[in-house]
C-alpha cells in the first residue's frame, strides 16, 4: 500500500474516509510492536506506554519528537533512505509552491477565509488565479489536525489577504508543491522535481527570515 513507513501505519479512514477496517490500523512498525500484538502488551517509549493505536502521535509535541528520533523506536524500516526526510523552502519558493500547488487541489478539500476570518466565496472565483491573488503574501502555515498515527489531516495557510484551510493528506501534499526544491533523505541523498510531498507525516517550522523547513518521514500514505 505504500513504499516506506515513517515508523507507523495509518488507518484507512484517516486517508480515504468511510468505515474503519479492522485490518488497516494505525500501529507502530517495529519488531517490538509485532511482539506486543502477539502478547497483548504495550510498547514502551520515552513519552510513556504506547498502546496500539492509542493516538498519542496526534499531539504535536509527541509527533515532533517521533520524527526527530527523540523517541527511540526500533522500526523495521529505520535504515531506509525515506524513513526520514527534510525540505527547505525560501519565502519566495514557498509562495511559488503554493501558487502552483493550490490549483491542483480538489475544490472540496479547500475552505477559504477573508481577512476577518469569515468563510469566503473565493473558491468560486479561484480557477486560473494565482494563490497570491487570493491569499496575498503567505504569512504562516500551520498543521491544525493530525490523525491517530500523526498523519497531517488539516492545514491552514495564512496570507495577508486571507487564509485557506486544506483538508486531507493528499491535498496537503499537493498544495506544498515541492517541484522547485530538494527533498533531502536521511542518507543525505537528494531528489527534486516532485509534484507532491513524499508523505503527510511531517511538521513545519518558519524561521525569522520567513523560510519554511519541513521535517518528515515515510513515502506514501501509510495505510497497510
What kind of feature is each model-predicted range?
Residues 1-224:
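Conserved, single-site charged/polar hotspot
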Amino acid at each position: 500500500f505504500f513504499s516506506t513507513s515513517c515508523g507507523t501505519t495509518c488507518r484507512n479512514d484517516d486517508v480515504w474516509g468511510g468505515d474503519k477496517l479492522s485490518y488497516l490500523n494505525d500501529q507502530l512498525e517495529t519488531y517490538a510492536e509485532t511482539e506486543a500484538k502477539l502478547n497483548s502488551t504495550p510498547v514502551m517509549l520515552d513519552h510513556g506506554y504506547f498502546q496500539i493505536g492509542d493516538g498519542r502521535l496526534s499531539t504535536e509535541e509527541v509527533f515532533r519528537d517521533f520524527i526527530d528520533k527523540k523517541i527511540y523506536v526500533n522500526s523495521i524500516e529505520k535504515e531506509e533512505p525515506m524513513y526520514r526526510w527534510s525540505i527547505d523552502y525560501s519565502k519566495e519558493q514557498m509562495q511559488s509552491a503554493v501558487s502552483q500547488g493550490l490549483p491542483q487541489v480538489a475544490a472540496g478539500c479547500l475552505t477559504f477565509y477573508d481577512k476577518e476570518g469569515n468563510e469566503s466565496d473565493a473558491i468560486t472565483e479561484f480557477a486560473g488565479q494565482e494563490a497570491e491573488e487570493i491569499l496575498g503574501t503567505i504569512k504562516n502555515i500551520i498543521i491544525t489536525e493530525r490523525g491517530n498515527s500523526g498523519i497531517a489531516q488539516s492545514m491552514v495557510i495564512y496570507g495577508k489577504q486571507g487564509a485557506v484551510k486544506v483538508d486531507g493528506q493528499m491535498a496537503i501534499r499537493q498544495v506544498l508543491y515541492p517541484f522547485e526544491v530538494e527533498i533531502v533523505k536521511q542518507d543525505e541523498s537528494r531528489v527534486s522535481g516532485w509534484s507532491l510531498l513524499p508523505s503527510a507525516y511531517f511538521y513545519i517550522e518558519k524561521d525569522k527570515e520567513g523560510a519554511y523547513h519541513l521535517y518528515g518521514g515515510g513515502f506514501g500514505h501509510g495505510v497497510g
